[in-house]
Amino acid sequence: MKDALIKRFEKQIGGLEHELTHELPKEIQRARELGDLRENAEYHAAKERQRFVEARVSMLKKRVSEIHLMN
């Protein structure tokens, strides 16, 4: 049970980290190229997604760490 949960969380972490390091930077760059960032909905949406993914990765890593500490 514990190992399956860790494996599931680590799979999610891997997917989110891929999005964070490969997909989101491209999205943010494309949105930047559209011009004025103050009124650029695509840019703000990509940055919001980036913050969400960073928070989710952090939470999942914390959970994995907590599971490892359980007996």
Predicted regions and their residues:
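N-terminal intrinsically disordered, low-complexity, charge/repeat-rich segments that act as generic
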Residues: 1-70
